[in-house]
Amino acid sequence: MEIGLTHTSTLTVENKHLAIQAGSGDLEVLATPVMMALMENAAMLAVKEALDEGMTTVGGHISSSHLKPTALGKTITATAVLTGIEGRKLTFKVIAEDETGTIGEGEHLRFIVDRKKFMAKLQ
């Protein structure tokens, strides 16, 4: 695994992605939690192929600003760039954009875990 790994995830805003549907607001605009989930998805996919067999990553923290609204039917992208590696802790810069430019930005932390050991914690 190396600094600079990048992935961009894409989403077309559907009714289920709106703040009024997600319960995070009462307007028909992209919900902040949906934007943040797309950021997490991009980070997860940025490093997926670099992990050893049986390993995955889990989200640990996200700090994000939602800067501009996005309407129903518009396409958004979220790009994650791996900026730091400290043992199992991975740090990403995340940016969300639509056709008008940047709509959100922040930092996301993920942790490398063994799938089986992590899921065993549910027992």
Where are these regions (language model features)?
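Generic helix-packing signal
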Residues: 43-47, 84, 98, 110
